[in-house]
Amino acid sequence: MMQTPFHKFFLLAMLSYSLLQGGHAADISMPPGIYDGTTLTAPFPYTVIGDPRGTKVTSSGSLELKNLDNSIATLPLSCFGNLLGNFTIAGRGHSLVFENIRTSTNGAALSNHAPSGLFVIEAFDELSLLNCNSLVSVVPQTGGTTTSVPSNGTIYSRTDLVLRDIKKVSFYSNLVSGDGGAIDAQSLMVNGIEKLCTFQENVAQSDGGACQVTKTFSAVGNKVPLSFLGNVAGNKGGGVAAVKDGQGAGGATDLSVNFANNTAVEFEGNSARIGGGIYSDGNISFLGNAKTVFLSNVASPIYVDPAAAGGQPPADKDNYGDGGAIFCKNDTNIGEVSFKDEGVVFFSKNIAAGKGGAIYAKKLTISDCGPVQFLGNVANDGGAIYLVDQGELSLSADRGDIIFDGNLKRMATQGAATVHDVMVASNAISMATGGQITTLRAKEGRRILFNDPIEMANGQPVIQTLTVNEGEGYTGDIVFAKGDNVLYSSIELSQGRIILREQTKLLVNSLTQTGGSVHMEGGSTLDFAVTTPPAANSMALTNVHFSLASLLKNNGVTNPPTNPPVQVSSPAVIGNTAAGTVTISGPIFFEDLDETAYDNNQWLGADQTIDVLQLHLGANPPANAPTDLTLGNESSKYGYQGSWTLQWEPDPANPPQNNSYMLKASWTKTGYNPGPERVASLVSNSLWGSILDVRSAHSAIQASIDGRAYCRGIWISGISNFFYHDQDALGQGYRHISGGYSIGANSYFGSSMFGLAFTETFGRSKDYVVCRSNDHTCVGSVYLSTRQALCGSCLFGDAFVRASYGFGNQHMKTSYTFAEESNVRWDNNCVVGEVGAGLPIMLAASKLYLNELRPFVQAEFAYAEHESFTERGDQAREFKSGHLMNLSIPVGVKFDRCSSKHPNKYSFMGAYICDAYRSISGTETTLLSHKETWTTDAFHLARHGVMVRGSMYASLTGNIEVYGHGKYEYRDASRGYGLSIGSKIRF
């Protein structure tokens, strides 16, 4: 199997080393081929080179080495090794593959033992290492004893290692008895990988399941995801470990792990005793990566002292099981984990048997990132994040929300939830003694959401001031949604919102509000954290908002009210422990963010009195009764209308010396105003749609009458109609689109013409809120026109009359935002009658190229009505019948021109329209669940408008004529278009 070229490579390497001792760096060509240990007829020539001036090995073709084993040799070696100087392996676009390599020295595939210099692997199409093993070596000692020495790294470098400009890099199922299942180096730089970069199922019995470094790990500017999948370390760092006590250890300040400007960073299914994904004795930073994901990494088990004495416990036993995804701790300086300018950051289902389900660190900083999510991580303490003594936390939601949800920690107390017979409780962040939060802020439209609580341990030597939402543009939300949140800080709120969801507690040393607002839901508590020793704390609130829906629900109000109430009220609470003084001033606000509270019949359909706020002013020193408060906002303009009155009463559940008061709010109902989703203006506006469909039939009739004169004939026309009315203050608009056909027959009797027509249209309408409808309309028409000469052959008089009846079926769907969609059908009836007269004036053909000028005046009477009908379902409405009448008078002039060479005709008409009379009854609507009734009018079409119409006729034969007809009508806030194309057969 191509043995000779590789033996020549071995000889050339030795010769180059001997000849270049005093000259330039060696440049050696690597032979191509496949070298399979199972078929080689001679031992594989393991190659060791070294040149103080450096060595560059250049690939001359793709090379694959597999099934090689020198693990029990007297002198086990790597396939390629370097002893001195810089070492570079240049691929020149070829592949380098190692498979099933077995040895008992550092670097089963490649090793660099040079004490200084740089090891570079570059420019390969593919670098792949599969199933390579570096086993324990047995070293003889004096006295006939032996010592077992573990081997490190499938690729090993005593100095810095660089992997760059390689299209595909993969390390699969490699195993080492020491550190670095795939790579063990002083520092490692991975840069410019283009198509694949995967470290999968590598195992190190000590540290760094995939990679271990003793100084710096850096992955920068890679165009593909860096994937660390299912790697295992017996001690630290299932994926990556930066360890200060490794081979060639650097100082603690040299250590760091950095990922910057990569397409993606992925750690999934890695495991170790400490740091399931990453372990570092220095800082860890993520900067500018498009996506960073840590999923299902595990740090386990914790250290258990043996029952029998003997032996020394491991130095890091206290950290066993810490850092399910990331472990970062520096005993000398702050070990910081930072995420800056990241696209997406996602931690989910990571598990720590000890502390920090996702992250264990001394300092954590998240800033200028897109969405950041910690979901479903689990630990004994610090479900998502654990920060050690004197730790620091900085959270800034700049380009996306920061969310903690479903993270759990183990509990030893009763009453906690049970998962697989283990008592657990929600927990986002745990901070040990002396910790502080330095930044907590969210940009406008962003939020930091604690669906799991954050807890700080007592014992801060100096209480720090935390300014929430500090900085220009930080007016977002800090939301505490579950559990007991404890912040041993003096909180200052200058802008944005602090929100407490139902049954949530927020305990702080003090809170001063100079701006922004505090939002509380029913059952939430804002209280003082108990410090040791006790401190004189205070709260000063000036802008407090309450969720009305939550208060009503937690008060258990009903319609009609019950006495006693059906449940014990659960108002918001401020200052429950009486460990400080509380002042609250300025107006308070009732908020109905989803606009449902004022539309709930069970809540505000009757007069109510609810408990809003239980306020403990503090017992030391005694405080006066709270000042009267006013309501800063009125009730909603939709739903139930009424007024609130506020009143303080002593809290009967607490003794007077506690200075506890209850703020009660009394509601007096005065009426009901339906919201835009309730109104259903489409019902009454459908009457206009029926009139428009009949008018389109009349336009088709008018087009069939014009054209060349004939005795009798039949015609057919396709028609379309579009009408739009602007939205009103409620957002209610109207759009009607219909199309169909019209067919008719005309017959002349002297100077008079009589005709019949049938029209069928199919339409769609919507109100631009939540209603849309389909309709089907049938129209029957009869029409008569006459024309008489008044003065010779130039002046004539004509008149016409048209009458139509239309019957339409409407099918409306209402897509509520708060309830299921409803469907209902009803019928419309419509009658339209037109009369008109004109004064046709014949013109000489040379004048304005016109043949006829016809001033005219018309009168159109339209009447439409809809029947009574009732919806079904929880949101059912009953609609009474309604009608619409309109008298319209168009006045205008029509111009006709006939071609002098062809039997074609062109017609143009312009008219001013005045609606002289209109009556709209409106539709009486009843919301059955509320027993509330209102009347909805159809929109009032502007009384004045203009209309233009044009037609063109072309005779195909002496008996067949085709034509097109279009019209446009404009009124203030509305416009309509119509088009018809048809054909006539003359007899």
Swiss-Prot record:
Topological type in the membrane: Peripheral membrane protein
Where is it localised? Secreted, Cell wall; Cell outer membrane
Q: Which domain of life is it from?
A: Bacteria
Alphabetic keyword roster? Cell outer membrane, Cell wall, Membrane, Secreted, Signal, Transmembrane, Transmembrane beta strand
Q: Does the keyword Signal apply?
A: yes
Q: Where is the signal peptide?
A: 1-25
Q: Where is the Autotransporter domain?
A: 707-987
Q: Which InterPro entries match?
A: Autotransporte_beta, Autotransporte_beta_dom_sf, Polymorphic_membr_middle, POMP_repeat
Main subcellular localization, coarse class? secreted
Which family does the UniProt entry place this protein in? Answer: Belongs to the PMP outer membrane protein family.
Quote the protein name from its UniProt record.
Probable outer membrane protein PmpG
Whose protein is this, by species? Answer: Chlamydia muridarum (strain MoPn / Nigg)
